[in-house]
Amino acid sequence: MRKLRNTLAAISILFLASCGGNKDYYMFTSFHEPANEGLRYLYSEDGMHWDSVPGVWLKPELGQHQLMRDPSMVRTPDGTYHLVWTTSWKGDLGFGYAYSKDLIHWSEQQMIPVMANEPTTVNVWAPEIFYDDEAEQFMVVWASCVPGRFEKGIEEEKNNHRLYYITTKDFKTISETKLLYDPGFSSIDATIIKRAKNDYVMVLKDNTRPERNLKVAFADSLTGPYSPASQPFTESFVEGLSLIHI
């Protein structure tokens, strides 16, 4: 959630969408700093060469700062697009949610108060949405800092993040918030993909100094337990990852 170096770093999830005619395109969601303008799209025919779709497609209305950072989207089997995003740097106890049938016209925006039972929570950062095709429900994972909750590392208490999650079928009734992953260090920007049945991969950012790099963990179940985090597979100062299973 530090200032992003480039547009690609702002990606929260890569998804495949049909963009008219009979041709399929890769698309991803993005945003521009200072993140108060709203949702943007980029598209590609091959997943390697990208161009922007002009315009802002959803202006943020929620939260203390009314931001749209880290937009993450998934398409369900019925063709509906479901979007979640970060609404504020600090102070909000939830993330934003909206849905659309065509990526143009969006539902009313809702705040999903996932940390309402933890009033000392500093933030709710980078929610990532995953559709569980086996359970036919959504899972959203995000990073929050609850001061004093975990052993203090080299980061200050208000920057000591861990990864949490909820599940829901409709974003009207949500599960109890649970801890997804404690790797023993401050971590953010987790994204999960399913490689096969009982085979899940989670990539996350080690948000401690001087690391600030990406690591990977594995699990037999979507909700874990996940393996210890790997050694970094990127240079330092990398975040905002995107994954797609090809």
What is the role of each PLM region?
Residues 1-8:
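Bacterial N-terminal signal peptides that target proteins for export
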Residues 9-15:
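Bacterial N-terminal signal peptides
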Residues 18-245:
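Carbohydrate-active catalytic/glycan-binding domains of CAZyme proteins
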